[in-house]
Amino acid sequence: MNIIINEIIDWIETLLSYTPGKVGTLIRTLWFRYRWKNPASVRVRPLSQFINPKQIAFLGKTSLGKQAFFSADGGSIEIGENFSCNVNCHINASVGGKITISKNVLIGPNVVMRTANHNFDDRDQLINQQGHNFNNIEIGEDVWIGSNCVILSGVKIGKGAVIAAGAVVNKDVANNTIVGGVPAKEIKKLK
């Protein structure tokens, strides 16, 4: 019976994701408020998708751009108040781990955060058969992540940090620091 109910819910959410305009945004916002772990004032734009929404907590006012993708199937996601992400953001804790985003965080378009990575150390076995490893991601308060950035598992980004567009962040970022590049390196400290 649960399979049928889940299938019906998937159909409803797919249809809702394509409903245009302000009415569509209102309907999606009301629908997902019921589905999330912690309902809050979240504006959901078209084509957004939420996998395992009961493990996704929005703690305050939030604005999500079109095609936002949040997956907590196996992990969890917690997002602080006054959060904004632009179009096509991919926030993924699907294999395990937790993504914690503090308050007053801005995320540009096409940003990817993923708590998991493929195992690949055993050269006698295909990579796609070696499973995954995972770790948490933590984003501090008042952080700006520019467009097309990738935040890898195990990373902590400190309060007031700025991640330059296109950066791949594979290690921690200190408070009030600008980083950029592949892999991301410190550009300067903010005062």
Question: Language model features by range: what are they?
Answer:
Residues 44:
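Short Cys/His-rich Zn2+-coordinating modules
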Residues 97, 167, 175-177, 185:
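Glycine-centered loop/turn positions within well-structured domains
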Residues 48-58, 64-153, 182, 190-191:
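Flexible, glycine/small-residue-enriched loop-and-beta-strand segment within the central core
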Residues 1-41, 104, 111, 117-123, ...:
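Terminal amphipathic alpha-helical/low-complexity segments used for targeting or macromolecular assembly
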